[in-house]
UniProtKB/Swiss-Prot annotation:
GO CC annotation, single: plasma membrane
Motif (NPA 2): 186-188
Name the UniProt record assigns to this protein: Aquaporin Z
The entry's keywords: Cell inner membrane, Cell membrane, Membrane, Repeat, Transmembrane, Transmembrane helix, Transport
Signal sequence, renumbered to the chain: none
Disulfide bonds: none
Localization per Swiss-Prot or TrEMBL: Cell inner membrane
Motif window: NPA 1: 63-65
Topological type in the membrane: Multi-pass membrane protein
Record gene name: aqpZ
NCBIfam families (alphabetical): MIP, PRK05420.1
Pfam families: MIP (PF00230)
Length: 231
C-alpha cells in the first residue's frame, strides 16, 4: 500500500508542478507566453507521463474525483479511497509550495493578486463566467473524464494506450474550460494552489471539491451501468 500512496503523491506533485507551474511561470511570459493552449498541453502531458511512469503501481489517479469516480464505477476498493485522496492532496500542496518559492524569486510577485493558477467562478472566473456556467462545465467535463478513464482502462480496450487517451482528454478538458473556471476537475489541484492564493480561492474551494467529485461519480455510474461489457 505504501508504494501505491507514494506513486499517487508523486504523480499529483508532477501534475500540479507541471500544469500549474506552466500557468504561473510560463503562460504570460513574455507577454502571451505559452497561452491557454500551452497550459492545456502541459496538464495533459503531466498525466500522460506519470501514468506511464507509475500507473502500473497505483493505477495513476492523481485526482480525488478520479479515485472516487473509479470507486463508483466498481473499479476501486472503498477501503483505499481515503488514503489515495490524502496522498494526492499532500503531493499537490508540496508542488504548490515549491512553485510559490520559485515564483517569489521574481520582484513584484503577489500570489493573492495574480490568482496563482487558482480556480474560480463569477468575478474570479478568467472569462467572467457565472457560478452556473462553472457548475455545468465542471460537472460535464468531470463526468466525461471518468468515462474516458473507464473506457480506456477497460479490459476489452486496446492494451497500452490508456495513458495517451487520458492525457489527451485532460488536454481537451483544459482547452474547453480554462476561460470558465481555470479548469479544475481535480480537487487536489484546486486545493494546492488555493492555499497559497489565500483569499477568494479558499472561499470558493468547496465548489471545486463538490462538483468534480459529483461529476466523477456520475461518469463512473454511467459507464458501469450503461457501457461496461458484461462477460
Amino acid at each position: 500500500m505504501f508504494r501505491k500512496l507514494a506513486a499517487e503523491c508523486f504523480g499529483t506533485f508532477w501534475l500540479v508542478f507541471g500544469g500549474c507551474g506552466s500557468a504561473v511561470l510560463a503562460a504570460g511570459f513574455p507577454e502571451l507566453g505559452i497561452g491557454f493552449a500551452g497550459v492545456a498541453l502541459a496538464f495533459g502531458l503531466t498525466v500522460l507521463t506519470m501514468a506511464f511512469a507509475v500507473g502500473h503501481i497505483s493505477g495513476g489517479h492523481f485526482n480525488p474525483a478520479v479515485t472516487i469516480g473509479l470507486w463508483a464505477g466498481g473499479r476501486f476498493p472503498a477501503k483505499e479511497v481515503v488514503g489515495y485522496v490524502i496522498a494526492q492532496v499532500v503531493g499537490g500542496i508540496v508542488a504548490a509550495a515549491l512553485l510559490y518559492l520559485i515564483a517569489s524569486g521574481k520582484t513584484g510577485f503577489d500570489a493573492a493578486a495574480s490568482g496563482f493558477a487558482s480556480n474560480g467562478y463569477g468575478e474570479h472566473s478568467p472569462g467572467g463566467y457565472s457560478m452556473l456556467s462553472a457548475l455545468v462545465v465542471e460537472l460535464v467535463l468531470s463526468a466525461g473524464f471518468l468515462l474516458v478513464i473507464h473506457g480506456a482502462t477497460d479490459k476489452f480496450a486496446p492494451a497500452g494506450f490508456a495513458p495517451i487517451a487520458i492525457g489527451l482528454a485532460l488536454t481537451l478538458i483544459h482547452l474547453i474550460s480554462i476561460p470558465v473556471t481555470n479548469t479544475s476537475v481535480n480537487p487536489a489541484r484546486s486545493t494546492a494552489v488555493a492555499i497559497f492564493q489565500g483569499g477568494w480561492a479558499l472561499e470558493q474551494l468547496w465548489f471545486f471539491w463538490v462538483v468534480p467529485i459529483v461529476g466523477g461519480i456520475i461518469g463512473g455510474l454511467i459507464y458501469r451501468t450503461l457501457l461496461e461489457k458484461r462477460n
